[in-house]
């Protein structure tokens, strides 16, 4: 394992295993966030409920320095009575790809490959239909085939609001169980953080106050689309004045 880890170059994503398995995915992510957020801004923490992936997680930092410090200090740390085993991840995460601008290139490559595969499959299907038609007595020499164009995957991209800079941030698309303590842990990583205001009358939104709009803008950039839970990327905007 040590030889394999040494062969992997340092990067922003850490692979963590030997974790306690009898803990919910939500609780695991919350606990890992508490432990690792002190090393630097975290873009994403990925866990899984599947039997194959139990006891494992991926922690995506914004920069390599933060990930390296976390690996050095937390590898072997006794977490829920089990020593964590940490190494750099072999491949770049989508979160990091979005940050450095290579995500869309990867996405286009995947879409092009999927489209090529789909076109080949459709061509084979059309050829087979034509051959079947031609075998029938009295069948026309050619047939017209109609296919539906390939649509996108339907994923909704939540965009931040286009409001002028403000020292207060408006955060939405939060999971219902997200509370002020969780948000304080996230945003207190950034200089100038003051306090969190939860909106009790409406779940899923909150206001985060900073000393000035420069500090709030830095926090917004770093935590934009951070996944508090795997299915809930939060959307951060300047609050309307």
Curated annotation (Swiss-Prot):
InterPro entries (alphabetical): Nucleotide-bd_a/b_plait_sf (IPR012677), RBD_domain_sf (IPR035979), RRM_dom (IPR000504)
Chain ranges of the RRM domain: 12-91, 167-241
Ranges that cross the membrane: none
PROSITE patterns: RRM
SMART domains assigned: RRM
Top-rank taxon, per record: Eukaryota
One Pfam family cited in the UniProt record for this chain: RRM_1
Region described as Disordered: spans on this chain: 99-169
Subcellular location: Nucleus
Keywords: mRNA processing, mRNA splicing, Nucleus, Repeat, Ribonucleoprotein, RNA-binding, Spliceosome
Annotated CDD domains: RRM1_U1A_like (cd12246), RRM2_U1A_like (cd12247)
GO biological process, one term: mRNA splicing, via spliceosome
Biased composition (Basic and acidic residues): 99-126
One Gene Ontology MF term: U1 snRNA binding
Biased composition (Low complexity): 129-152
Similarity remark: Belongs to the RRM U1 A/B'' family.
Its job: Involved in pre-mRNA splicing as component of the spliceosome. Associated with sn-RNP U2, where it contributes to the binding of stem loop IV of U2 snRNA.
Record's subunit section: Identified in the spliceosome B complex. Identified in the spliceosome C complex.
Protein name listed in UniProt: U2 small nuclear ribonucleoprotein B''
Classification lineage: Eukaryota, Amoebozoa, Evosea, Eumycetozoa, Dictyostelia
Encoding gene (name): snrpb2
